[in-house]
Amino acid sequence: MQVDLLSSAQSAHALHLFHQHSPLVHCMTNDVVQTFTANTLLALGASPAMVIETEEASQFAAIASALLINVGTLTQPRVQAMSAAVEQATRSQTPWTLDPVAVGALDYRRRFCVELLSHKPTAIRGNASEIMALAGVANGGRGVDTTDAAANAIPAAQTLARETGAIVVVTGEVDYVTDGHRIVGIHGGNPLMTKVVGTGCALSAVVAACCALPGDTLENIASACHWMKQAGERAVARSEGPGSFVPHFLDALWQLAQEVQA
C-alpha cells in the first residue's frame, strides 16, 4: 500500500486558490462548535453561513459554494433540514461533505448517515472508528472519540470511497486522504489539538470548502489537513494550554493565509 506525501508547494497552491475563491460554506454543524468552525473558515478566507431552518436549508444549499453536514448534535428537526439540504445540493450539484460524528456508537445517526450516502457526498471526514463504522467494518468509538488508529482504517476508507465516489479523510496522529485508489498521508499537528472541542469539526468545514475549489480535489482536501496541522503546531508553540491555544490557532491560520498572498 503506497502512501504519498503532500508537498509544501501543493499545499501553498491550494491555499492560494482557497483565498482567491473564498468559498461560501453552508455549515449545518453541531451546536458545540459553530463559533469555532465559523472563525476557522473566516481566518482562512472563506465565508461561513450557519443556516439550519428546514424552510431555508434547501434554498441556501442551492446558492452556497459547498455544504457541510455534521451530525454531532442530531435532532429530528435537523434530520429533516439536513435531508432537504442534501437533496437540493444533489440537484444543484453543490459539493457536500459528511462528518459522521460518533456514528460508530449510536444507531440512529448511523442509519441516517448511511441513508445520506445514497446522495453521493463529495467528501467524508471522520476519525478511524467513525470511518470504519460507516463502511460497515466495525462499530466502535467512545462517543466522539476514536478507539482505533487512523492507519487501521485505510482499507475501510478506500472501500467507502470506491462505493460512494467520495474522497474520504481519516484523521488522527497522521491524516489519510483517499479516493479509493490514491492515498495521501499528512503528518504533523500536536496532541493538544485533541484537548480543544471542535478542531476535527472545523477541519470538516475546511474540507467542504476545498471541495468547491478548482483543480485536484484530493490534493486540495489533503492540503486542508496540512493547514490545520501546521496551524496547530504554531499555536502550541505559543500556548500554555487549551485555553490559550484557540486564539493562537486562529491567528496561525490567518498568518498561513496571508503568507501565500505575499
Curated annotation (Swiss-Prot):
A molecular-function term among this protein's GO annotations: ATP binding
Name the UniProt record assigns to this protein: Hydroxyethylthiazole kinase
A Pfam family it matches: HK
Any one GO BP annotation for this protein: thiamine diphosphate biosynthetic process
Positions of ATP binding: 125, 171
Residues annotated as binding substrate: 50, 198
Domain of life: Bacteria
EC number of the protein: 2.7.1.50
Biochemical pathway: Cofactor biosynthesis; thiamine diphosphate biosynthesis; 4-methyl-5-(2-phosphoethyl)-thiazole from 5-(2-hydroxyethyl)-4-methylthiazole: step 1/1
Role summary: Catalyzes the phosphorylation of the hydroxyl group of 4-methyl-5-beta-hydroxyethylthiazole (THZ).
Catalytic activity reported: 5-(2-hydroxyethyl)-4-methylthiazole + ATP = 4-methyl-5-(2-phosphooxyethyl)-thiazole + ADP + H(+)
Keywords: ATP-binding, Kinase, Magnesium, Metal-binding, Nucleotide-binding, Thiamine biosynthesis, Transferase
Cofactor(s) demanded: Mg(2+)
Protein family per UniProt: Belongs to the Thz kinase family.
